Curated annotation (Swiss-Prot):
GO terms for molecular function: glycine hydroxymethyltransferase activity; pyridoxal phosphate binding. It comes from Flaveria pringlei. Its cofactor is pyridoxal 5'-phosphate. It is found in: Mitochondrion. Catalyzes the interconversion of serine and glycine. Its main location: mitochondrion. Its EC number is 2.1.2.1. This is Serine hydroxymethyltransferase 2, mitochondrial. InterPro entries: PyrdxlP-dep_Trfase, PyrdxlP-dep_Trfase_major, PyrdxlP-dep_Trfase_small, Ser_HO-MeTrfase, Ser_HO-MeTrfase-like, Ser_HO-MeTrfase_PLP_BS, SHMT-like_dom. It catalyses: (6R)-5,10-methylene-5,6,7,8-tetrahydrofolate + glycine + H2O = (6S)-5,6,7,8-tetrahydrofolate + L-serine.
Length: 517
């Protein structure tokens, strides 16, 4: 008690004016810290509070500098990676708050630690807002907001609702699926999901680029899955949830919709919702939803059906899923993330958010249209959401080489497999999305410009490939270092940066940046 009293006196002993932290931003302010002499007078040797209250640029200038470099990268570059976005200042304030200090194993009202009354308030509010954001009836749906990320969230569901070696069907990874849905090759189980469960992929019709639902149904009849995943990481078309629901009903299988990439679009109501058909829905929270880096699991509750005896049969997902998350696979939740997620979910119910997601869709349509006019092939021929998957094979180049040039000119995108690829190491495509740049204020005409800059980068990659002294990626990278190509890279990078720098930064003020030039 004596030390606590002394520390309280120390915290109130200075009458100096407030100082801004984090390079003059408006995130936090605090009283200037008392001098060493005050510490020695009040409690000799107790100097660590000064270290704990020091701003980042004082306490760790090396890390502070790395953050400043990342700010500059985000400002000067074109962020086209589908799974990224720029979260809001208020979300970052919540994530960087004192909520990170508390440990809270368990659930609201049933914790294994004391002092969680405000943590309970934040988590309960987050759950309420999650249901509201997706227009769900709390009597029919519940939600767990504790999963740390999307892949663990999916594994929580498998663990909760399946037995070891039960069967799962999901979209094949090279056809746009995700690792966490149980990807394996003929010789190796890549995802841990395929170790603990038996998995079979369904695929696209390679001639159309759309999911082959007829073949999916035939495969399900033979494989008899216990769970079918409707979700993708690189599929530019809408899912036919009703069709998969019929397949699930026929097989008495659970329908898990993984909407990690599209949840922001679903929340805004600009694409169809999986909640009308799915039993369980998972999502990450930092992609199109534009929150912090976390995940959620939604599950049906209440009456499932009336049996032959006339008795109501209830869904039993809630307890199973909650127990799989904790104590099954996780310990204490990340309370700062849950608090930040609550903020993001409130934003997701606003008119501004709906307008943003509508612009995401419009931008992607324009992006796709411009790319096609420039001679690019898109998997499925176009887009119905926020992404384009470019098949580069008709350009005589692969995604790995194009990605290297894009990165050199400060365009962030990622190589991606496309149907027909024989090697994931040399994928034939590039995956790009519109959410992040739309957050910065890009509209249709800007994405026409982005498509033009992308085209210049691809043409440069083709030239470099033609001059490379070998067929390996390292030979291509070596060829990039020639003075002639470095000059072209430098010019294109300058054009990219000058265009990107016209737009607002998100979460920090341009004026406070250390590296503006």
């Amino acid at each position: 008690m004596a030390m606590a009293s002394a520390l309280r006196r120390l915290s109130s002993s200075s009458n100096k004016p407030l100082q801004r932290l984090f390079n003059g931003g408006h995130l936090y302010s605090m009283s200037s810290l008392p001098s060493e002499a005050v510490y020695e007078k009040e409690r000799p040797g107790v100097t660590w509070p000064k270290q704990l209250n020091a701003p980042l640029e004082v306490g760790d200038p090396e890390i502070a500098d790395i953050i400043e470099l990342e700010k500059a990268r985000q400002w000067k570059g074109l962020e086209l990676i589908l799974s990224e976005n720029f979260t809001s200042l208020s979300v970052m304030q919540a994530v960087g708050s004192v909520m990170t200090n508390k440990y809270s194993e368990g659930y609201p009202g049933a914790r294994y630690y004391g002092g969680n009354e405000y943590i309970d308030m934040a988590e309960t509010l987050c759950q309420k807002r999650a249901l509201e954001a997706f227009r769900l009836d709390a009597a029919k749906w519940g939600v767990n907001v504790q999963p740390l990320s999307g892949s663990p969230a999916n594994f929580h569901v498998y663990t909760a609702l399946l037995k070891a070696h039960d069967r799962i069907m999901a979209l094949d990874l090279p056809h746009g699926g995700h690792l966490s849905h149980g990807y394996q090759t003929d010789t190796k189980k890549i995802s841990a999901v395929s170790i603990f469960f038996e998995t079979m992929p369904y695929r696209l019709n390679e001639s159309t680029g759309y999911i082959d639902y007829d073949q999916l149904e035939k495969s399900a009849t033979l494989f008899r899955p216990k769970l079918i995943v409707a979700g993708a990481s690189a599929y530019a078309r809408l899912y036919d949830y009703a069709r998969i629901r019929k397949v699930c009903d026929k097989q008495k299988a659970i329908l898990l919709a993984d909407m990690a990439h599209i949840s922001g679009l679903v929340a805004a109501g600009v694409i169809p919702s999986p909640f009308d058909y799915a039993d369980v829905v998972t999502t990450t929270t930092h992609k199109s939803l534009r929150g912090p880096r976390g995940a959620m699991i939604f599950f049906r509750k209440g009456v499932k059906e009336v049996n032959k005896q006339g008795k109501e049969v209830l869904y039993d997902y809630e307890d199973k899923i909650n127990q799989a998350v904790f104590p099954g696979l996780q310990g204490g939740p990340h309370n700062h993330t849950i608090t930040g997620l609550a903020v993001a979910l409130k934003q997701a119910t606003t008119a501004e958010y709906k307008a943003y997601q509508e612009q995401v869709m419009s931008n992607c349509a324009k992006f796709a249209e411009t790319l096609v006019k420039s001679g690019y092939e898109l998997v499925s021929g176009g887009t119905e959401n926020h992404l384009v998957l470019v098949n580069l094979k008709n350009k005589g180049i692969d995604g790995s080489r194009v990605e290297k040039v894009l990165e050199a000119v400060h365009i962030a995108a990622n190589k991606n497999t496309v149907p027909g690829d024989v090697s994931a190491m040399v994928p034939g495509g590039i995956r790009m999305g519109t959410p992040a740049l739309t957050s910065r204020g890009f509209v249709e005409e800007d994405f026409a410009k982005v498509a033009y800059l992308f085209d210049l980068a691809v043409k440069l990659a083709v030239k470099i490939k033609g001059e490379a002294q070998g067929t390996k990626l390292k030979d291509f990278v070596a060829a990039m270092q020639s003075s002639a190509f470095q000059s072209e890279i430098s010019k294109l990078r300058h054009d990219v940066e000058e265009y990107a720098k016209q737009f607002p930064t998100i979460g920090f003020e341009k004026e406070t940046m250390k590296y503006k030039n």
